[in-house]
């Protein structure tokens, strides 16, 4: 096949120039195809030597083409070429080898050509929707929205679309995106902001689509890891941990439930479980031992994860989507270590919340309560019984039974200093939080207090000087504590114990959490970055203060980690535009105004607000907090 049947003339010329610039050495190109699969644009990703080049496939989007040259002119793939092409080819991409003159080509993996869809048969008086749902109301706005999304997915584009209330957005975006995913064997993600919309999709809209499309597909709702029971944690609980008989009964009921549950999902429970108990038995990412766990084969979370990996359509909330995205940012967009399986098409419903969700996700947070709770998980000096005294006490008890007396002496010699240093570290940390809290003691009442921390205003105040002095002491205590912990862990690791129940594992993970907490503490208290706004809140009627560092702008993060990785994305909501323009949304999200693969649509509501709606504001209503408010309001509405 002629190279010009696969690569446009301008792209051929660009590659010739780049290979010449690289002195004829290997160059790794990102090939960007048009709708018909012709490479119309190339971008240099890496330059190498005569025989090799870095293959940075994580910098490419799905459905593109790896192109690299062989300076020798011998266009036979190496073992590395085949391996890398195989990995990228799994995502629908292609891989070509060219010579330095760019007039010859070898196809390792052909570019997968996508099947285009046509949704016309589903809408209209004789459409499939109407045939399945007799009372279906045909709305021009819904068809207009659905056709716009059809064009976007067919053309490998992003689309921003505001559709007013009453459009029927979920059906409008589900039909084209789901149909496209099914026809091309792709995975679709629907990300929402609210539980209500997730339940609507799961229990109403998607089952309805199954009837309309008459096509087989699997779908699932992804829940956070903390919703699942962890068998290892559950059966490591000692009933003597709990003084209250009612608490012991709850633990017993959890164990009975484990015997019959298929999912281990907390929502199955008919009994409300206090969080203080649930968190001792739920699944947590950093406390998971994975395949090493004795319960791995029957793990609820990994069973759910397998179900997710086999699904064609996945429903998530925005927070989980960005939690997954942060992992992809660390290890590469197409990775097996992510929370979600790899995906190809994304719909963000309630997209006006994305910026806030992303900003919240990238926010650092510390609190007095959180600090005390974390240290208590390691060592709780107020409790002497084994289970609730913290993971350190459990580790010491375990080591005392596993090691002979001479080996345990080394541990025992560090025990006192480790506990004393933990206590001192805790006391100084609480002292700092209390110093921050003290100026607002008189204001604490029924409402939350929120203030921005302006370093220039407070740095010369006596209160800030006290905090700075205490923080210097706190840092010194942390350094000494870290040294002692390292000595303690080195002794343990030298013995290579089995740790079947994960007692040492849990202790190490809580220490890791403490290290991360201290890093966040330093970042917030130092207040040095101009890219963040620093602020705090004081909880009403409680001696708890929370401190935050929130990024001013997340657009670059979103541009680099999301928008540059995928094209087929739908951003929709009833409120995205300001005065009929998407400028603010685009700027806050990191969109390029000149992006040729972006379309924008503004669809009005089918409701005639001017003639069908009135706004009434009662001037004599009672306090909304009154128990009589609803009854009084009913009377008011009846009068209307």
What are these model-derived regions, one by one?
Residues 154-159, 186, 312, 567-568:
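Pre-Walker A (Motif I) flank of P-loop NTPase domains
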Residues 173, 179, 199, 204-207, ...:
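Signature of the SF2 helicase/ATPase Hel1-core->accessory helical subdomain module
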Residues 94-95, 102-144, 150, 154:
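Helicase-associated low-complexity/disordered flanking segments
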Residues 1-6, 14, 32, 46-115:
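Active-site-proximal loop/helix of nucleotide/amide-processing enzymes and allied scaffolds
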């Amino acid at each position: 096949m002629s190279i010009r049947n696969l690569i446009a003339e301008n792209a051929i010329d660009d590659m010739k120039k780049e290979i010449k610039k690289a002195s004829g050495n290997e160059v790794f190109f990102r090939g960007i195809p048009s709708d018909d699969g012709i490479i119309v644009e190339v971008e240099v990703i890496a330059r190498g030597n005569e025989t090799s080049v870095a293959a940075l496939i994580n910098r490419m989007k799905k459905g593109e083409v790896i192109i690299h040259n062989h300076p020798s002119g011998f266009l036979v793939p190496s073992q590395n070429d085949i391996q890398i092409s195989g990995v990228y080819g799994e995502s629908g991409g292609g891989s070509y080898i060219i010579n330095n003159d760019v007039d010859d080509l070898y196809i390792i993996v052909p570019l997968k050509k996508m099947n285009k869809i046509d949704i016309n048969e589903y809408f209209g008086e004789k459409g499939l929707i109407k045939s399945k749902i007799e009372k279906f109301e045909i709305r021009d706005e819904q068809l207009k929205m659905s056709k716009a999304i059809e064009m976007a997915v067919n053309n490998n584009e992003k689309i921003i679309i505001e559709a007013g209330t009453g459009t029927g957005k979920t059906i409008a975006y589900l039909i084209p995106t789901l149909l496209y995913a099914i026809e091309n064997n792709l995975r679709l993600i629907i990300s929402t902001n609210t539980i209500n919309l997730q339940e609507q999709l799961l229990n109403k809209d998607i089952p309805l689509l199954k009837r309309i499309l008459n096509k087989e597909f699997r779908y699932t709702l992804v829940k956070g890891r903390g919703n699942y029971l962890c068998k290892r944690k559950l059966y490591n609980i000692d009933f003597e941990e709990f003084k209250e008989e009612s608490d012991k009964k709850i633990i017993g009921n959890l164990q009975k439930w484990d015997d019959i549950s298929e999912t281990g999902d907390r929502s199955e429970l008919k009994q409300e479980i206090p969080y203080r108990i649930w968190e001792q038995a739920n699944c947590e990412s950093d406390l998971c031992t994975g395949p090493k766990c004795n319960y791995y084969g029957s793990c609820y979370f990994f069973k759910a994860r397998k179900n997710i990996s086999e699904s064609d359509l996945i429903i998530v909330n925005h927070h989980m989507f960005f939690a997954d995205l942060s992992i992809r940012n660390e290890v590469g967009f197409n990775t097996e270590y992510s929370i979600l399986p790899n995906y190809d098409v994304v719909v963000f419903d309630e997209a006006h919340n994305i910026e806030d969700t992303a900003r919240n996700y990238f926010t650092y947070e510390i609190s007095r309560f959180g600090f005390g709770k974390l240290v208590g998980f390691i060592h709780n000096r107020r409790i002497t019984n084994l289970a609730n005294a913290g993971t350190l006490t459990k580790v010491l008890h375990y080591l005392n039974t596993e090691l002979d007396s001479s080996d345990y002496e080394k541990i025992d010699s560090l025990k006192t200093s480790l506990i004393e240093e933990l206590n001192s570290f805790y006391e100084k940390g609480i002292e700092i939080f209390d110093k921050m809290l003290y100026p607002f003691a008189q204001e604490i009442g029924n409402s939350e207090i929120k203030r921005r921390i302006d370093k220039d205003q407070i740095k010369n105040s006596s209160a800030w000087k006290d905090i700075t002095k205490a923080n210097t002491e706190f840092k010194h205590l942390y350094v000494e504590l870290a040294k002692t912990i390292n000595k303690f862990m080195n002794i343990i690791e030298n013995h290579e114990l089995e740790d079947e129940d994960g007692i040492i594992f849990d202790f190490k993970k809580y220490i890791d959490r403490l290290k991360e907490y201290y890093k966040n503490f330093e970042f917030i208290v130092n207040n040095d970055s101009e890219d963040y706004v620093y602020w705090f809140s004081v909880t009403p009627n409680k001696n708890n203060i929370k401190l935050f560092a929130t990024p001013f702008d997340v657009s670059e993060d979103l541009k680099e980690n999301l928008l540059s990785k995928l094209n087929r994305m739908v951003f929709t909501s009833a409120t995205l535009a300001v005065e009929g323009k998407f400028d603010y949304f685009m700027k806050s999200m990191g969109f390029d105004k000149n992006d040729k693969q972006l379309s924008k649509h503004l669809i009005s509501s089918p409701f005639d607000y001017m003639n069908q709606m009135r706004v009434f504001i009662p001037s004599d209503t009672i306090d909304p907090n009154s128990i009589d408010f609803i009854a009084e309001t009913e009377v008011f509405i009846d009068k209307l």
